[in-house]
Amino acid sequence: MYDKYTYLFPYEKVPQDSRIIIYGAGDVGQEYLQQMEITGYCEVVAFVDKAYDKYAPMIVPIYPVDSVRSLSFDYIVLAFKMGAHVRTVTKKLMELGVPNDLIIYIESRKEVDLFISENGDTDSGQCDFAYNRPGISIALKYGPGLGDAIVKKKIFMELVSMEPNCYIDIYCPGISTVVHSFYSDQKNLNNVFDDGGALYAGQFKKYDLSLTLSFMMEVDSASYERLKEYNIEFAEKMKKLQEACSNYHLTGAGVIQRYVHFHRMKFLGFDYYTYPNYTGVFDIIDHKVTIPLDASFKEMFQKLALPGQYITINYGGGVAANSTNNEIAKEWPFAHIEKFVKLFKERYPQVGVVQLGSAETIKVVGVDAFFLGENLELVKYILRDSLVHIDKEGGLVHLATQLGTKCIVCFGPTQEEYFGYPENINLKAGNCHGCHCLYDGFDVCARSMEQPECMWSITPERVMREVEEYLNGESR
């Protein structure tokens, strides 16, 4: 049969019979591995991944990134959907002794048809799949983002409202714990699979309905005859959905698709939550999704002895979180954050400042308490009781907003119209904004500025004014 690959291995850059390491065990890495298994073009020695310990065993070993020092290989192929972290990762690999010319990256391209043998199905083992249960079975394929899992819960809930007697499996790379945390109140959730894409590729056609949810929506498979057996109205809606997605007419590399999509939605008045409405199938009218709290963490939160009143801040974008060099264009500059904390403590010495983020995040001087790499259930409680959360556009903003905490959000490359919440205080400055996906990745400024104007123009003083107005009850 033929399968379509958005992420075609960079054959033109890697000589045949090379020994390669794939950096990144998510969707792209799994597609590269599958292509190498089918074609025998290269030998995959190993995966390396920052979150190596979150993946189930694979047919090739997976190691932490530092292991490249001891592995024998010819090339390292970066398996990223977007170029957001390419520069940072390349720099890290070079520091580990990997020559720049042995580090290979290519962005996603237009879909390419590859011939796949009929026996290329993934071994499903003894997994508990929704298609083995009575009723309508649905598979949803997610990406790896914390905030994305929150936003996509809205679509999950909409599907359940259309067909209450469905069971839904979610496939996601490395964030099953996050999804369980956010969806534990959903009785229609059957299972969550930590999957980089290989398992989904082998299973999605067995479901009554399979959808890929990114910034856009794709109908990968739909069995109308079976859907009609259970719910004729739902079957007709899903048929309409597939036709609408097919007629959307977005071609070319994924980065180009997203940029065009964002601007189409701007003209239609839709955003990250409401964009499915363009299909005529959904009627999403708000941004609200439920975020359950694990009661077992309440006592732990109460024992933290945090200041009676506090604000929360976040700095960092994944692999760049341990650096002050602001290698991610959408990051509010580290120097600005430190200056803001200084201004805030001078004005509100009695109010604490709590820093949240990943374990490797660099600490901001002047902060009263650090919770870096903490359990997500505990972070929920901390965010919920924060007076206000200061951040760039990202996952913690989605979480804090759904928990009812006001956020002051610094917007630059990412589009406020698409990713912003009207109830938050969304800040923009300078003369250009919204270039995200004009180029591939968050680390790229469309004007090639070392200090992107959009983010550097949002001064600590301005953020301080907004915080002060909000805390004094003068703000929106």
Where are these regions (language model features)?
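Hydrophobic, well-ordered beta-alpha structural blocks that scaffold small-molecule cofactor pockets
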Residues: 1-121
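Leloir-type glycosyltransferase catalytic cores
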Residues: 241-303, 423-476
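Donor-binding and catalytic core of enzymes assembling or modifying cell-surface/extracellular glycoconjugates
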Residues: 325-413
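Histidine-anchored nucleotide/phosphate-binding helix
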Residues: 32-34, 140-163, 337, 341
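Conserved nucleotide-diphosphate donor binding/catalytic pocket of glycan-assembly enzymes
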Residues: 189-290, 306-326, 414-417
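Short internal beta-strands
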Residues: 43-50, 167-175, 354-356
